[in-house]
Amino acid sequence: MTITLNARLALRPVHPESDGALLHGWVTEERARFWGMLERPLDEVIDIYTYIQEQPHLAAYLVCWDDEPWALFQTYDPAVDEIGEFYDRRPGDVGVHLLMGPGKRPDGFSEAMFTHLPGWVFSDPGVQRIVLEPDARNNASVSLMPRIGARLGPQVEMPQKTAQFAFIERSGWTAPSV
């Protein structure tokens, strides 16, 4: 089921078998090293996204502009995910991950995405806060956080990375001008 966010921007669930080659190409590029899949073969990437698809607390979507995929957007429930053990979790938290696809993005894409994705997450009345936790070494991601309305939280040592937590509160969120 495709979720229309505006006239040109939409989310559609990842279909591991048919989207596997696309995702494999994205997550095995050096710029995606923080996703930890640089050396994964195609079949393992498909298995990972099949697992995500089967879990009620996880979801993966392709962010599409004019029906073309330009980014990967994932959501998770920190109450179930191991991430929830590393920060002061609250009821109504939803974690998100975002990986931009390669290439020059179309005009208007980034602004629409950063306006509509948090708005879509907050369309669930139970969501009170969006949790982001990129690798602290991912300067591009960390520097973007305040520009999209996120408040930087603590850096936390985790088994696979040092996470820079950031939070977008429902009560204080307005669509950013990116």
Q: What is each of the regions a protein language model found here?
A:
Residues 5-7, 56-57:
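Short, basic and Ser/Thr-rich N-terminal targeting/leader segments
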